[in-house]
Each structure stands twice: as structure tokens, then as C-alpha cells.
Design a protein with these regions (language model features):
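N-terminal beta-loop-helix "entrance" segment that forms/cooperates
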Residues: 41-49
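Short, glycine/charged-enriched secondary-structure capping and boundary segments
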Residues: 19-21, 48-49, 73
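Non-catalytic, surface beta->alpha helical segment in thiol-disulfide oxidoreductase systems
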Residues: 58-85
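Thiol-based oxidoreductase modules, predominantly thioredoxin-like and allied folds used
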Residues: 7-9, 29-42
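Structural micro-motif
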Residues: 49-59
Length: 85
């Protein structure tokens, strides 16, 4: 499984997301993938999973099926997300 966070790099929530990813990595040893919705590949990812609110975290299985999605703030707890990492 993998966890992806979709957020706009130039936004008011970017610092919060970066801090969360750093804390998540330190706590679990796993990385969260980043997607910028302003890039062509990021826009395609957002259309695929119907992501319209930022930040959004999404847990995907190995075949790309969505397992869980957390939209907006507050961000989910590290323990909630670590189950899927």
C-alpha cells in the first residue's frame, strides 16, 4: 500500500503538510508521496480519484484502488495513516 498527499506547494496549508510529512517519516520510517495538483500528472491523478479539496491524503492498495481518503484540515493522525503505509 501507499499513501499520497495532494496539496498545492504555494498555499497556506503547505507548511502544515510538510511538517506532517516530516513527523510521519520520523515516527514510522515510511514516506508519504507528494502530488502537486497544478502539474499535468497531478491534475490527472486528481481527476482519477475525484480530489477537489486540498490538502487531501489518500491510501491506495498495490493495484491503485482507494482504501481511505482524508480531505481538508485537520490532517488525520499519524496512527490513522500509518496503518496504510
Amino acid at each position: 500500500m501507499r499513501v499520497v498527499v495532494v496539496y498545492k506547494y504555494e498555499s497556506d496549508h503547505a507548511r502544515e503538510v510538510l511538517d506532517y510529512m516530516r513527523d510521519f517519516s520520523r515516527s514510522t520510517g515510511h514516506k508519504i508521496e507528494e502530488v502537486d495538483p497544478d502539474t499535468p500528472s497531478g491534475a490527472h491523478f486528481c481527476r482519477t480519484y475525484d480530489i477537489v479539496e486540498y490538502p487531501t491524503m489518500i491510501a491506495l492498495d498495490s493495484s491503485g484502488r482507494m482504501q481511505q481518503m482524508w480531505r481538508g484540515r485537520p490532517l488525520p493522525t499519524i496512527s490513522e495513516v500509518s496503518f496504510y503505509a
